[in-house]
Amino acid sequence: MGPLSILTIIFIAVVIDLLFGELPTNIHPVVFIGRIIEIFKKLKERYSLINTRIAGAFLTIFLIILLSWIFAFIIWIFKFNNLLMIIISSILLSTTFSIKLLINSADNVKIDINHDIDNARKSVSYLVSRDTSQLSYEKIISAVIETLTENITDSVVSPIFYTFILGVLGGIAYRVVNTLDAMIGYKNPKNINIGW
């Protein structure tokens, strides 16, 4: 695909995400990735330190290859018609974005914070991993801004960048690595020995 096709796919994918948001969880590729990572996390307890490190590296490579192969196959099926291929590629790429979800989540906090701070705390808890039960008005606003700033990079700018540079499969590979980072990339006691 040429640069114009890639730009068209990116544009359509963003529009799809803005209009429709996330796919249902039972068919969402990121949820599929997450399930495989969860299975790995349960199995890793059986491995020695070196095997856990090797398995973590293998998991990364395996997921990138698996998802890239699945998406490439789906795109290839529609290669006979360029317009269909662009539409299907756009739908697949839209799964790497979370623009509408981010906007809606921030809007929910904005609405809640003006009416009920406890509801605002609960709404912001869906955006951050920290304890939100005692956050003040200012801390809630700060948490939303921090989350939006980080997630604009993770869920908008980076998928677009990698897709533009490496094509649709580059955007997909980015989302795999980003999901791995979010789920097992933190150097806490549970994840310290996964990969290097």
Please report, for each region that a protein language model flagged, where it lies by residue.
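Hydrophobic alpha-helical transmembrane segments
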Residues: 1-173, 177, 185-196
